[in-house]
Amino acid sequence: MSSFSAECWDFSGRKPSFSQTCTRLSRYLKEKGSFGDLSLGMTCKPDVNGGSRQPTMMNLFPCEASGMDSSAGQEDIKPKTMFPRQSSFSSSSSSGTKEDVQMIKETTKSVKPESQSAPLTIFYGGRVMVFDDFSAEKAKEVIDLANKGSAKSFTCFTAEVNNNHSAYSQKEIASSPNPVCSPAKTAAQEPIQPNPASLACELPIARRASLHRFLEKRKDRITSKAPYQIDGSAEASSKPTNPAWLSSR
């Protein structure tokens, strides 16, 4: 081993490479044959007679296990029935269960559902009628009668409306004039309407004429209300003026 440990270092003082370590490991295995005892005392040791003993499981709770074994030897433990079997109605069931079933059926047949009663209020013809302890069956009968009566009244009302409508339509047809002659009469009576395009052209002319009339009236008013008369001044300006000193010469 001393030679092997000494060879682990090179002469130069450097660490060996991976290939060198592998070669040295193979050389060591060839010399020694194995790595030694690596089982750490966990291998099965053979008995004195030469046979190997099978490994046994470690008992973590030895006290409880021994108590369970002793109680199991003394008494047989019976499992509890959490869901007991119900009595079936098959032929294998006992006669007692059949009798019980028949008794239950008879009692259910004999017992009738009690009719529930409550106060009933009816609004009819502008009146209010209140009945105490009115059974549900009678209330249903009253509702059925009301539905039948409402259906009959509705059919009668619709028939009357249809008859009145037909009679009114016949009267209108009889009172109305001949529909063929009416368009000719209306066309003759109605005046001929002018073309809207011609009206649009005539409107500016009428406005222009009315504007001229308005301006003429305003012109007359302006001339009459002026502080001096325009016509007189024009005549005076047209006549020559002869001063007195010119006439003396």
Curated annotation (Swiss-Prot):
GO terms for cellular component: nucleus. It comes from the Eukaryota. (Microbial infection) Acetylated by Pseudomonas syringae HopZ1a. Keywords: Acetylation, Jasmonic acid signaling pathway, Nucleus, Plant defense, Transcription, Transcription regulation, Ubl conjugation. Induction: (Microbial infection) Triggered to degradation by the pathogenic Pseudomonas syringae HopZ1a protein in a COI1-dependent manner, thereby activating host jasmonate signaling. Residues 225-249 are annotated as: Disordered. A motif (Nuclear localization signal) lies at residues 206-213. A motif (Jas) lies at residues 204-229. GO terms for biological process: defense response; response to jasmonic acid; response to wounding. Expressed in cotyledons, hypocotyls, roots, sepals, petal vascular tissue and stigmas of developing flowers. Expressed in stamen filaments after jasmonic acid treatment. Residues 113-148 form the Tify domain. Coiled coil: none annotated. InterPro entries: CCT_CS (IPR018467), TIFY/JAZ (IPR040390), Tify_dom (IPR010399). It is found in: Nucleus. Its main location: nucleus. Residues 235-249 have a biased composition (Polar residues). One of its GO terms (molecular function) is identical protein binding. Repressor of jasmonate responses. Jasmonoyl-isoleucine (JA-Ile) specifically promotes COI1-TIFY10B/JAZ2 interaction. Activated by MYC2, MYC3 and MYC4 transcription factors. Interacts with and suppresses RHD6 and RSL1 transcription factor activities to negatively regulate jasmonate-stimulated root hair development. Belongs to the TIFY/JAZ family. The jas domain (204-229) is required for interaction with COI1 and Pseudomonas syringae HopZ1a. Homo- and heterodimer. Interacts with COI1, MYC2, MYC3, MYC4, AFPH2/NINJA, TIFY10A/JAZ1, TIFY6B/JAZ3, TIFY11A/JAZ5, TIFY11B/JAZ6, TIFY5A/JAZ8, TIFY7/JAZ9, TIFY9/JAZ10, TIFY3A/JAZ11 and TIFY3B/JAZ12. Interacts with RHD6 and RSL1. This is Protein TIFY 10B. The lineage of its organism: Eukaryota, Viridiplantae, Streptophyta, Embryophyta, Tracheophyta.
